[in-house]
Amino acid sequence: DMRFSLLNFMRGKIRESLPQQMQLCGYRTTFQTVGPHALLFAGFFKSIGFDDFYDRRAQGTVRFAERDSFYYDNYLRYFREHRAASAKPMFTMIETIATHWPYDKPFMPEVRVPGGGPDTHPEVHEYLRRMSMAAIDFERFLENLRTSFPGEPFLVVSYGDHRPHVNRYLQPGLEAQLSSVLRKPIGFDSDAYITYYAARGINFSVPSLPRHDPLDIPYLPAVIAQLGGLPLSDAARERLRLLERCNGLFADCPDRPAIRAFHRRLIDSKIVLAD
């Protein structure tokens, strides 16, 4: 898989990531992944600023996909242990997988939650079931943060890394776009790439999100740093300037020279090592 080869290739070549910024601001940084990646990829994630890396074995998973509450409960335990030993703030990236494909079999069929209506495609129904479970678990997680750590401020940013496969049943023509990706690249403005992000605060007032819709993902780390009130690096400030100049677009920014110049400055300043 080219994605995994890229992680190994880029190990040690990124000098300014969001977790690295967090480290500079005194944060402990942790990553909870759903995969069995500790042996292969812990080096990459540590190289971009994660102090601790918990793969599926470290988290005690017993099956491919656990309910979201499993990973949230692990975080609550990790943070409770951290807070007992240190007053440092903590930045954590948590992966979840319960809403992921495949949808041909019910996930935790004993759990009764809303799905689709009578005429809903079976896979769409299953996806909606899992989204209902995910929404319940997420709200419960926020409530646990609120009650378990009264007065502790949290900024919780959630986002989807890709669209669910069931979109092929919901949007005519999208399946053809997705199936053609390997044969012919599709434009970055395609619906096939659109997902979501959201920010919630616990004992923390979240500033207004950028007005741009869509917002390309290369801007998200700088947006998170700004929402959290962190000091912004020169590169982060430039990303936010480009966000405004390009109206939220990055790959399809009309000012291509500005994007290329930004990439060149990242390389020339050794923020990204190109050799």
Task: Name what the model sees in each region.
Residues 1-275:
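Solvent-exposed soluble domains appended to multi-pass membrane proteins
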